From Swiss-Prot:
Protein's recorded name: Albumin
Family (UniProt): Belongs to the ALB/AFP/VDB family.
Keyword hit for RNA-binding: no
Gene that this polypeptide is encoded by: ALB
Residues the record lists as binding Ca(2+) 2: D13
Main location: secreted
Organism from which the protein derives: Capra hircus (Goat)
Keywords, sorted A to Z: Calcium, Copper, Lipid-binding, Metal-binding, Methylation, Phosphoprotein, Repeat, Secreted, Zinc
Length: 90
């Protein structure tokens, strides 16, 4: 939250609404995974996460990597649902 408020404060100094600025800055964090799921499907997305995580943290067990990738995929789906709900309410 401190980082978010710091970013918002910087953009507010530029005369922009802070919440808008943060949403614009963080939009790619939602869009990129959603686009990858659309392109490769959930299975392919989870495999990509497992490969990425194994390269960064080889000491983590395969079952743990699989569980983390499943949770990340579920989170992306939840964010997609939230975004579509917000768009419907707007």
């Amino acid at each position: 939250d401190t980082h978010k408020s710091e970013i918002a404060h910087r953009f507010n100094d530029l005369g922009r609404h802070p919440e808008y600025a943060v949403s614009v800055l963080l939009r790619h964090l939602v869009d990129e995974p959603q686009n990858l799921i659309k392109k490769h499907g959930e299975y392919g997305f989870q495999n990509a996460l497992i490969v990425r995580x194994x390269x960064k943290a080889p000491q983590v067990s395969t079952p743990t990597l699989v569980e983390i990738s499943r949770k990340q995929t579920a989170l992306v789906e939840l964010l997609k649902l939230v975004a579509s709900t917000q768009a419907a309410l707007a």
